[in-house]
Amino acid sequence: MGEQKQTFIEHLTELRKRLIISFLAVGVGFAGSYVVSKQIFNFLAIPLQKALPPDSTMIFTSLPEAFFTYLKVSLLAGIFVASPMVLYQVWLFVAPALYSHEKRYVVPFVIISSLLFLAGGAFGYFVVFPYGFKFFMSFATDYIQPAPKLKEYLSFCSMLLITFGLVFELPVFVLFLTKLGVVDAKMLSKNRRYVILIIFLGAAVLTPPDVVTQVMMAIPLMALYEVSIVLAKLVGKKKARAQDSR
């Protein structure tokens, strides 16, 4: 019992160490990002600025709103900058509990997941934002003019960028479910038509009402789903070979 208790205490000590290092990394990233927080926000605002009518500007309606907006920008950027160090600390904590064959998958998993998340965010920023903002601006009239607030715009952008980043994680998510036996390639292929319908409905809601834009948004999502099916097939074949060899 004493040895088990000591082992448990060692785990808590190790967890505390990794958390402290992770928080310090985020703190350093936050401090560095705050220096250029205005530039970061200006970069996020470029798609909206291009969609706004001439001479239009963003506003803040409470005295501390701009200050807290820049703090939030700094925190989000700090977490992003510190994410490699945070993931490394997670790896150092869980690695001793993994088998050698499991450790081989960790680095590729982290790299691929990170790249897919960045690709999703970039897709949202460079593709969806410009067309989406133009669509929203189309509702303006001579009597109704846009006056977007800093705080609301940052929240809106953050939500969409994170959403698109998570959507682009679809192949990794499906691969994980396939390994657990929850889904397989046959099931994914069988439901392809329903997934395509959902994708186009989502594209129709998020983009202006023209076919070209909707297709431009739907194609990457359809491609990700097809990649997921291919990965599920590969996992299924590997499982079948492993069972045959027993």
Regions inferred by a protein language model and the residue ranges of each:
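Membrane topogenic/interface segments and analogous intrinsically disordered interaction regions
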Residues: M1-R246
